[in-house]
Amino acid sequence: MRIANKFLVPKESENQRIDQFCLKILPLIKRSDFFKYLRLGKVLLNKTKPQVNTRLKTKDEIAFLFDINPYLQTNNDYLSLDLVKDKLKIIFEDENIIVVDKPTGIVCQPDKKHSIINLSNMLLKHCGYRQFDSNKLNFYPQFAHRIDRNTSGIVIGAKTNKALKELNKVFKNNHLTKRYKGLVFGQFNHLGLQTAYWKKDNNNGIVTVKWKPFPEAKKISTFFENSSYIAQKDMSLITIRLISGRTHQIRACLNLFSNQLVGDKKYSLIQFKNRNNKYKHQALHAYELVFPKLETSKFPILTNYSLMQFKSKIVPWFEYLIQ
């Protein structure tokens, strides 16, 4: 059962039939398909199989035991946040910023496939929003950056407009220290600063990384701090400090060394195909974030967080793999 597929019944849906409520949540599903899932026990009400004519009560829990993303509405301009049940895993929070741990399998921002369950909507719900209309709000709490859906770890957000502007400036200039843990196939022997050239294909979302400059490519820098080889698994646990912050930078860069992240399907290498297929997520975890020393004149809000260090409280799945 996936957490992302659970919903709480809001007060305004009290006494509604379960099929009517579910068909509103999943507007793109065929009625026949929904009733098939209901019949097969893939729709649960408070952890039990309901009858089709069951009437709902406030705070009833509905769980879908199938992938609901193809059936969700893609227009996210207006959203009832009562449908968002998941809670943030908070590392730090005050009146200006919030630092959270993102689990694997959840996207940071809404997209066509994840219009309801995403980290952004969880933040809005946490901050007391019951409804969200992006056309009517000048500012709303939001995250200043994102990590991949199948990467876990630290994400930082802003709760005020001033804090967001300063965070955006800090990220734009790569001032924050961002460290990751990763698990790669084979022995990794490329410690230290590595520079390469990066380009993203916006049509398919794939990035290309090469050692030498090529047309429209941008220079990237990655510092590989530590590597521990686990001989019985033929894998290496590595620590990475991200200097520039380009899309899929770590994942694509590792291919240059004929290594790849365990579980990475997008940037997989043929020699690891058979071993790689058994893993659902890529073995990458954002485990530490450190603020630099910030000047009060330039960062009147964030100066209070100068040199603050935040560490993830999640133990990534791949560390259990090598124990």
Curated annotation (Swiss-Prot):
A GO biological process held by the record: enzyme-directed rRNA pseudouridine synthesis
Catalytic residues as annotated in Swiss-Prot or TrEMBL: 148
Keywords in alphabetical order: Isomerase, RNA-binding
Pfam families: PseudoU_synth_2 (PF00849)
Catalytic activity: a uridine in RNA = a pseudouridine in RNA
Superkingdom of the source species: Bacteria
Domain S4 RNA-binding: 16-95
GO molecular function: catalytic activity, acting on RNA; pseudouridine synthase activity; RNA binding
Enzyme Commission (EC) number: 5.4.99.-
UniProt similarity note: Belongs to the pseudouridine synthase RluA family.
Name under which the protein is recorded: Uncharacterized RNA pseudouridine synthase MG370
Native source species: Mycoplasma genitalium (strain ATCC 33530 / DSM 19775 / NCTC 10195 / G37) (Mycoplasmoides genitalium)
Lineage: Bacteria, Bacillati, Mycoplasmatota, Mycoplasmoidales, Mycoplasmoidaceae
